[in-house]
């Protein structure tokens, strides 16, 4: 399927949430949110299930976390990829937890009790927030950690997105955790353009998500969160209990795939889609083919 057709179908599917509906055991409905990495990982899940012989319906581009979770609870979708940090902070309104195992344990327990949603095995991929720079700036300014950026900030220009300036796990939280971070200038951009500003010399530091494709394609440096401020954001399939009870093999299939979705793999695949303009379905297919999973159908 071409990228344009996939996007058109995704937009159509995600534009309206249907009324609540009963579980349809003849197919597995896989959802996604409205950004590249969510499309990609949802497509990996969908193709893995298809390779195992299941019928899959894709309901992508649902929008925000709130919309995706509502679709799950209504029974409009059976599973989608979610991040532990997003569930912890945006859904459960808890404080950030840097420890990946602890964050996963909390969200999996509460989601099962409160929403009848099961978290399957998480991937090692951790799409946390971060600050990035070029290797040249990191070397010339001698900045490797966030503590060093906090001190050097009055001589540095920040490129970021608007919400980073107000979120508790954005700039205000960094200032509380590290002190400093009084940048010489702060300018806001669209998500992709903040990296352009960095590469064109209009900024010295950019806010980042640590699996962004630009980090791989532009060879950027992610600065070390040496005080472990940011929460873990490991991705995992979240599945309705009713769907899992009817098709327990969903867990076996997706738990076999999740360990292979690493930071490096995610950055590479995101770059293939965003920079090289490859079709997410093709990228997902190549990834699954490389795994050579036993029992998969081709």
Question: What are the roles of these predicted feature ranges?
Answer:
Residues 1-14:
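N-terminal secretory signal peptides and thylakoid transit peptides that target proteins
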Residues 19-20:
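C-terminal motif of bacterial Sec signal peptides marking the signal peptidase cleavage site
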Residues 27-57, 62, 124-196, 200, ...:
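Bilobed "Venus flytrap"/periplasmic-binding protein-like clamshell domains
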Residues 37, 163-177, 248-298:
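An extracytoplasmic/periplasmic, membrane-proximal ligand-sensing/linker region
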Residues 64-65, 75-88, 103-107, 134, ...:
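Beta->alpha turn/N-cap motifs
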Residues 73-82, 154-156, 173, 199-208:
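Alpha-to-beta junction loops
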Residues 91-120, 200-202, 214-228:
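Ligand-binding "clamshell"
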Residues 129-139, 234-247:
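A bilobed periplasmic-binding-protein/Venus flytrap-type ligand-binding module shared by bacterial periplasmic
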């Amino acid at each position: 399927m071409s990228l344009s057709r996939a996007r058109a179908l995704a937009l159509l599917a995600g534009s309206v949430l249907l009324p609540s509906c009963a579980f349809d055991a003849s197919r597995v409905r896989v959802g996604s949110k409205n950004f590249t990495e969510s499309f990609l990982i949802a497509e990996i899940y969908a193709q893995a299930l298809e390779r195992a012989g299941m019928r899959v319906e894709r309901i992508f581009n649902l929008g925000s976390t709130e919309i995706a979770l509502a679709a799950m609870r209504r029974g409009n979708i059976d599973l989608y990829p979610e991040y532990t940090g997003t569930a912890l902070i945006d859904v459960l309104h808890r404080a950030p937890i840097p420890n990946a195992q602890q964050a996963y344990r909390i969200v999996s327990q509460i989601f099962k009790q409160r929403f009848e949603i099961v978290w399957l095995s998480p991937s090692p991929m951790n799409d946390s927030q971060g600050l990035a720079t070029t290797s040249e700036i990191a070397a010339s300014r001698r900045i490797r950690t966030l503590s060093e950026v906090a001190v050097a900030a009055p001589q540095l220009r920040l490129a970021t997105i608007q919400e980073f300036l107000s979120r508790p796990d954005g700039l205000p939280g960094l200032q509380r955790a590290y002190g400093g971070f009084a940048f010489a200038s702060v300018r806001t951009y669209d998500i992709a353009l903040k990296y352009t500003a960095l590469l064109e010399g209009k900024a010295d530091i950019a806010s980042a998500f640590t699996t962004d494709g630009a980090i791989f394609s532009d060879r950027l440096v992610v600065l070390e969160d040496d005080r472990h401020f940011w929460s873990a954001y490991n991705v995992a399939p979240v599945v309705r209990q009713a769907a899992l009870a009817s098709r327990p093999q969903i867990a076996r299939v997706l738990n076999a795939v999740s360990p292979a979705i690493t930071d490096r793999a995610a950055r590479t695949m995101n770059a293939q889609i965003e920079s090289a303009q490859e079709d997410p379905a093709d990228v997902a297919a190549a990834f699954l083919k490389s795994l050579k999973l036993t029992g998969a159908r081709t």
